[in-house]
């Protein structure tokens, strides 16, 4: 066959738009507009090239994966009430998109993300089944890469999804350590006072690049 970077970019763009990666996340605060990759399909397909997304946009992306294609806008609110407790506005999730992707494809993606977690010493130690993907984003050779993690839990019936980014954080392992604490807090896996101590947790942290 003949390789076509142009055709490859068209296909990549098609699927990125299906995931609404060309839209802001919906949060009620100022948010930088996403930038989808526009050149070099080989590098773009692994998240490099000129693509740029906020952490909240990555959070909506992994939420869509966790829900097998159901896409929602993010919000900072649950509801607005008056002084008497009457609900003035409800911020219950509204479906904004539904990807037409086969269930077997979602299962394959979920299984791959589960495999990442089971092979990770930190994530596999949790008493809740987690699925996720680690990554490092290289921006400048003169500075450390950004550490990233996206994931959801529980694996079989997802309830929460998250994205963690540590700017110039060296390693995705450092982002995983933050994610572990979030999962532990949500599912009461560790004492709250230990998790919210007000001091930095240096366990499992590294300045060695990974991924």
Roles of regions detected by a PLM:
Residues 54-60, 174-181:
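Short amphipathic alpha-helical face segments that pack within enzyme cores
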Residues 166-170:
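A generic structural motif
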Residues 74, 171-174:
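Extracytoplasmic/secreted cell-surface and envelope-processing proteins
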Residues 87-89, 94, 178-211:
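Short, gly/Ser/Thr-rich active-site loops of penicillin-recognizing serine hydrolases
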Residues 1-165, 210-211:
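Beta-lactam-recognizing serine transpeptidase/beta-lactamase-like catalytic domain environment
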């Amino acid at each position: 066959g003949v390789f076509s970077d142009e055709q490859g970019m068209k296909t990549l763009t098609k699927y990125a738009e299906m995931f609404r990666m060309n839209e802001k996340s919906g949060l009620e605060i100022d948010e930088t507009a996403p930038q989808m990759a526009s050149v070099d399909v080989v590098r773009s397909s692994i998240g490099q090239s000129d693509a740029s997304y906020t952490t909240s946009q990555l959070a909506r992306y992994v939420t869509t994966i966790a829900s097998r294609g159901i896409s929602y806008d993010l919000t900072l609110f649950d509801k607005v009430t008056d002084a008497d407790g009457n609900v003035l506005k409800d911020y219950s999730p509204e479906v904004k998109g539904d990807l037409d992707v086969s269930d077997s494809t979602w299962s394959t993606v979920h299984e791959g993300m589960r495999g990442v977690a089971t092979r990770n010493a930190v994530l596999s130690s949790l008493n809740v089944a987690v699925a996720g993907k680690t990554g490092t984003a290289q921006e400048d050779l003169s500075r450390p890469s950004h550490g990233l993690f996206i994931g959801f839990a529980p694996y079989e019936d997802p309830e929460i999804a998250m994205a963690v980014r540590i700017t110039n954080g060296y390693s995705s392992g450092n982002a995983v350590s933050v994610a572990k604490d979030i999962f532990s807090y949500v599912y009461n896996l560790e004492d709250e006072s230990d998790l919210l101590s007000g001091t930095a947790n240096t366990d499992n942290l590294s300045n060695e690049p990974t991924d």
